[in-house]
Amino acid sequence: FLPFLASLLTKVL
């Protein structure tokens, strides 16, 4: 799981 993906998820949520 990439940290960059986590940032996108947080942005969407």
From Swiss-Prot:
GO biological process: defense response to bacterium
Subcellular location per the Swiss-Prot or TrEMBL entry: Secreted
Keywords associated with the record: Amidation, Amphibian defense peptide, Antibiotic, Antimicrobial, Secreted
List of residues that carry Leucine amide: L13
GO CC, alphabetical: extracellular region
Tissues with expression: Expressed by the skin glands.
Source domain of life: Eukaryota
Entry function: Antibacterial activity against Gram-positive bacterium S.aureus.
Family recorded in the similarity comment: Belongs to the frog skin active peptide (FSAP) family. Temporin subfamily.
Name under which the protein is recorded: Temporin-1Cc
Organism: Lithobates clamitans
